[in-house]
Swiss-Prot record:
It holds the Pfam family SPOUT_MTase. S-adenosyl-L-methionine binds at residues 72, 103, 122-127. Homodimer. GO terms for cellular component: cytoplasm. Its EC number is 2.1.1.177. GO terms for molecular function: rRNA (pseudouridine-N3-)-methyltransferase activity. It is an enzyme of class 2 (transferase). Its main location: cytoplasm. This is Ribosomal RNA large subunit methyltransferase H.
Length: 155
């Protein structure tokens, strides 16, 4: 199973790239984890936000292909580390690749939300999108370590 993190935004601070890549490289070869960045629509004082969301959403869904789609969204379901490990196993047993979607400043398009089979909430707080990339990478690596009996996660 391959996991894709599809995120709106291409100009992230260096610490985001470093943090994401630190966990990305730890994933096993049979579970590659890749980041796909979607160029954010141009926002300005008179920007048509609905149109921008639609364009970003279309690009995200195209990148997903036939993968299982999981959105990252505040109203989604929150999981403990053990529950995330169970989700990871369930996704693996499903036999499909998984695309996790992180929206831009205004969130995800209605089309992305409608296409999602699951929605995952990291927190009821609004988190900066660059930080979410690193938190998701670490959380998934920790969940994988539980399923593989790797010593990374400690109770």
């Amino acid at each position: 199973m391959k996991i894709q993190l599809i995120a709106v935004g291409t100009k992230m601070p260096a610490w985001v790239k470093t943090g994401f890549e630190e966990y990305q490289r730890r994933f096993p070869k049979d579970m590659p984890f890749e980041l796909i960045e979607i160029t954010a629509g141009k926002r300005g004082k008179n920007a048509d936000i609905a149109r921008i969301l639609e364009q970003e959403g279309k690009a995200m869904l195209t990148a997903c292909g036939k993968n299982k789609i999981v959105t990252l969204d505040i109203p989604g379901k929150s999981w403990t580390t053990h529950q995330l490990a169970q989700q990871l196993e369930s996704w693996k047993n499903d036999g499909r690749d998984v695309s996790l979607l992180i929206g831009g400043p205004e969130g995800l398009s209605p089309e992305c939300k409608a296409a999602a089979e699951q929605s995952w909430s990291l927190s009821p707080l609004t988190l900066p999108h660059p930080l979410v990339r690193v938190v998701v990478a670490e959380s998934l690596y920790r969940a994988w370590s539980l399923t593989a009996n790797h010593p990374y996660h400690r109770e």
